[in-house]
Amino acid sequence: FAANEAVVGALAQSLREAPPRFIVTCARGSSDHAAAYAKYAFETQLGMATASASPSVSSVYAAEQRWQGALFLAISQSGKSPDLLRTAEAAKVAGARVVALVNVADSPLAALADTVIPLHAGAERSVAATKSYIAALAAVLHLCARWSGEAELNAALPALPGALRDGWDVDWSNLSEGLVGAHNLFVVGRGYGLGIALEAALKFKETCGLHAEAFSSAEVKHGPMALVGPDFPVLCFGQDDDTLAGTLAVA
């Protein structure tokens, strides 16, 4: 957080002085799952409507967007995805303010953006972009805390690195026993946990070759639950907030 405090603080002050009409996120893969987390952070802490832009709308359909006065938040590990760049360019033309959360600081996306928040995750050498995903979550929370000025959220930021270390030190191996022999998996979360569930499902696909699908605990009952039978594994992410009871009820 210290490395980005100056840029995030200045951006937050500017956004408070001239609030955007709404927020548009744009990302692919793991970064899009970080954007799903950002939606809940911005909407719950700032009351700011946040929507995800499909890059294909600009890169394939070349459709003109009405984003005047919007905050366009692009999240990317490499900052080189052609369709993401095309959408960011379209956002600038449409009058949006472009902010990039990007791991490669000298990338084309960084050069295009009005403001760059570096992720500082280091080089991603594996296909599964875990470091930059976690760094993107932290950057989103940093911006949200400074922008909102919410005292409890700002006070909690310094404890986050320690909490991550504690999570890393936990022995999670017992959870893998339920996946032995599995061919399919549901990963369930809600609210802030939905973006985490989406990313976990992707990681199971990428690293384990396991067919995993993520659902909101509010949506999984509307059709997908029909697939669940005896010995069908379901992994639930239940954070300690008002969504917990509903997620546990699904479990």
Could you tell me what each predicted segment is?
Residues A18-G162, R190, M225, P230-D231, ...:
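Glycine-rich phosphate-binding loops that contact phosphosugars or nucleotide phosphates
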Residues F1-F22, A163-D169:
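An N-terminal, well-structured beta->alpha segment
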Residues E5-G9, A51-S58, V98-V99, G167-V170, ...:
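Short gly/ser/thr-rich secondary-structure transition/capping motifs
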Residues L157-G178, V187:
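Active-site/ligand-binding-proximal alpha/beta "capping" segment
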Residues V7-G9, E152-L157, L175-S176, F215:
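Flexible, glycine/charged-enriched surface loops at secondary-structure junctions
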Residues V180-G246:
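Acidic catalytic cores of enzymes that act on phosphate-bearing nucleotides/polynucleotides
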Residues G69-F72, S176-H183:
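Bateman (tandem CBS) regulatory domains
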Residues A12, S173-S176, M225:
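Short hydrophobic/charged patches on amphipathic alpha-helices used for structural packing
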